[in-house]
Amino acid sequence: MDQTQNTIAGIGEINGSIKTEINAIATVDDSNEKLNQIINSNQKILELLHQLKLTVSSFTPASQLHLLQRLNSLVMELDNMAKLSDKCNIQVPIEVLNLIDDGKNPDEFTKDVLNKNCIAKNQVTKGKSDAFKGLRKHLLEELEQAFPDEVDRYRDIRASYAAEAKRLAQTQSVLPNGDAKVKSEL
């Protein structure tokens, strides 16, 4: 394959990946559009139910036609929402539905799930960090028995590096973890 063919093949691969990304973005936009249509349909249904309640609460034989029109509008909107829901695939955990049935805020479920996941990941990370600290300590103890002079030099180098990093961080308004301090403007 010559240089021109390589270039054309490379461009084809780039175009293919761009098309894939565009299709993925279009799919997300399409899903959001469908979800927005369902939300709008829900709002219309709530509005129609409210109007229907008002019509029924002040019902007179003369308002029967008006009541039937509102009932027909509600049925049409429910049918529209059913059609829209077939196009939109949203999975809601049963726990969220149970919370709603119990009159609780479904955001609590999301908060609990995120907290549990974060706590679990933090514990795993802390365990790994503690294991590495223990390994480092054990290695230093073993090295100190075998090479005491080298370990002393290593500790001196680490101490001077830590002092320099701390001094540099203080002069540059950088936190020890590498984050920059941000001054709040009031």
Curated annotation (Swiss-Prot):
Record has Endoplasmic reticulum as a keyword? no
Give the organism the record lists.
Arabidopsis thaliana
Q: Please tell me where this protein is predominantly located.
A: nucleus
Give GO cellular component annotations, separated by semicolons. mediator complex
The cross-references to InterPro entries, in alphabetical order and at most eight, read: Mediator_Med10
Q: Which family does it belong to?
A: Belongs to the Mediator complex subunit 10 family.
Changing residue 118 to S does what? Loss of oligomerization. Loss of oligomerization and dimerization
Q: What is this protein called?
A: Mediator of RNA polymerase II transcription subunit 10a
Function of the molecule: Component of the Mediator complex, a coactivator involved in the regulated transcription of nearly all RNA polymerase II-dependent genes. Mediator functions as a bridge to convey information from gene-specific regulatory proteins to the basal RNA polymerase II transcription machinery. The Mediator complex, having a compact conformation in its free form, is recruited to promoters by direct interactions with regulatory proteins and serves for the assembly of a functional pre-initiation complex with RNA polymerase II and the general transcription factors.
The keyword Nucleus belongs to this UniProt entry's keyword annotation: yes
Q: Which gene encodes it?
A: MED10A
What are the protein's UniProt keywords? Nucleus, Transcription, Transcription regulation
Q: How does it assemble?
A: Mono-, di- and oligomers. Component of the Mediator complex. Interacts with GEBPL.
GO terms assigned for molecular function: transcription coregulator activity
Where is the protein situated, by its record's location annotation?
Answer: Nucleus
Q: Which Pfam families would you find in this protein's record? A: Med10
Biological process (GO) annotations? regulation of transcription by RNA polymerase II
